[in-house]
């Protein structure tokens, strides 16, 4: 994974526009190793539930051992999405996530990657320079098991405004 210091200060010219996300397209990218230190740090700062912070509490929980917060998993997914394509795209942000499911726990030592499937792409009626992309994101662990799914919309500048 790229460190924050390695990220560009100014956005480069976009490689990907709305037209580059046809329905049915599937992209797989990213590699993020989950560390115990990161699980504990995220939990301390953002989700201080005992099963994310304490080995004994985690062992007594449904997780059976220390597990990452689901919100930490979302944050790791977002980082992989940024590095995988968003930082190189004409992204204009997102109006939101419509569905989010945590399917399996994420543990220290897991290695995650992302699969992104475009399920809808349409021009934005009120803004001819913008297109909407609905995507289904799946985060998978090293065994290929889905640990998280989410579906949401992204807004992207169009390369050719007004085209269909």
Give the ranges of each region predicted by the language model.
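HotDog/MaoC-like acyl-thioester-processing domains
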Residues: 2-22, 102-164
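Hot-dog-fold acyl-thioester-processing enzymes
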Residues: 2-96, 161-164
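Short beta-strand or tight-loop elements
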Residues: 95-98, 114
